[in-house]
UniProtKB/Swiss-Prot annotation:
Entry's EC annotation: 1.14.11.13
Underlying gene: GA2OX7
UniProt keyword annotation of tRNA processing present: no
Pathway recorded for this protein: Plant hormone biosynthesis; gibberellin biosynthesis
Name of the protein in question: Gibberellin 2-beta-dioxygenase 7
Gene3D superfamilies reported in the protein's UniProt record: B-lactam Antibiotic, Isopenicillin N Synthase, Chain
Keywords: Dioxygenase, Iron, Metal-binding, Oxidoreductase
Enzyme class: oxidoreductase
Length: 336
């Protein structure tokens, strides 16, 4: 049985028309252009624990500068064993290789309803359609993964333990530079509301360059991405879309909306997108650091750019905007 979702059939049932010729035509929210690829700042985390103060300070300075200028950076020597990524990728492939009819079943592998997602049910125009599928796994539900996928559950738990350690270190370093105490992040790293998103981007089924993931910012505090070497991630910088060159054995880190608000706009939550590969599949695993729904986000710094709001309020507003317009308006809703 086929594992790939019926993208063409689904698209035509929604829009009843042919797909735009290219992403440059379909991206109605910006007049930006495609540019050649860049290599994001690469930060060696081993310098934080090397015992050499000069290297540690330089590492922190590089991280802060990247978070301010790009909202993205890559990290190497993070201490996560290579086999953890290899085992996680293997389990990810097993999940996506299941027949489509099995993946869409309610409570597949005892994951919560709507954990499996594909296309873009919120799309209000052809420009907002995505040729991808994903498993959205909230960390508080990992222990519920069915016994027939015991290996998946064990490996996800190991992966989360490792990636969360790195995420907490980065959050505390960046937070300290904008006067946020490390205690602020303690409840966040109970990880009840954080989640993994396993992504599979399919080669274009429309005969043109299309989105694997439409332009957006992340709602999280921080996102850490493990990806293959296929490429396709692009970020918006100074009015241009820039393709990001994968760096072997590096993790990609990006600032989310919550950290931009908390830092009073010092750190940048940057719009990014994924272009579907031309003739090969692309896989990635994203870890999103999110607070409890009732966590209050209040800017550190004056004059404050954003009013105080809860994570629940932000999520509900974003979901409403997506339903109404197909796009998340984001932090501009909360400007003072």
């Amino acid at each position: 049985m086929a594992s790939q979702p019926p993208f063409k059939t689904n698209f035509c049932s929604i829009f009843g028309s042919s797909f735009p010729n290219s992403t440059s035509e379909s991206n109605t929210n910006t007049s930006t252009i495609q540019t050649s690829g860049i290599k994001l700042p690469v930060i060696d985390l081993s310098h934080l624990t090397s015992g050499e103060e000069v290297k540690r300070k330089r590492c922190v300075k590089q991280m802060v500068a990247a978070a301010k200028e790009w909202g993205f950076f890559q990290i190497v020597n993070h201490g996560i064993p290579k086999d953890v990524f290899e085992m996680m990728l293997l389990e990810e492939k097993k999940l996506f290789d299941q027949p489509f009819s099995v993946k869409v079943r309610e409570r597949f592998s005892d994951l919560s309803k709507n954990s499996y997602r594909w296309g873009n049910p919120s799309a209000t125009s052809p420009a907002q359609y995505s040729v991808s599928e994903a498993f959205h796994i909230i960390l508080s539900e990992v222990s519920r993964i069915s016994d027939d996928r015991n290996n998946l559950r064990t490996i996800v738990e190991t992966y989360v333990q490792e990636i969360a350690r790195v995420a907490q270190m980065i959050c505390e370093i960046l937070g300290k530079q904008v006067n946020v105490s490390s205690e602020y992040f303690e409840n966040i790293f109970e990880l009840e509301n954080s989640f993994l998103r396993l992504n599979k981007y399919h080669p274009s089924v429309f005969g043109s360059e299309v989105f694997g993931l439409v332009p957006h910012t992340d709602t999280s505090f921080l996102t850490i991405l493990s990806q293959d070497q296929i490429g396709g991630l692009e970020l918006e910088n100074n009015g241009q879309w820039i393709s990001v060159k994968p760096c072997l054995e590096a993790l990609t880190v990006n600032i989310g909306d919550m950290f931009q608000a908390l830092s009073n706009g010092v750190y940048q939550s940057v719009r990014h997108r994924v272009i579907s590969p031309a003739n090969i599949e692309r896989m990635s695993i994203a870890f999103f650091v999110c607070p409890y729904l009732e966590t209050e986000i209040d800017c550190f710094g004056y004059p404050k750019k954003y009013r105080r709001f809860s994570f629940r309020e932000y999520k509900e507003q974003s979901e409403h905007d997506v339903k109404e317009t197909g796009d998340k308006v984001g932090l501009s809703r909360f400007l003072i």
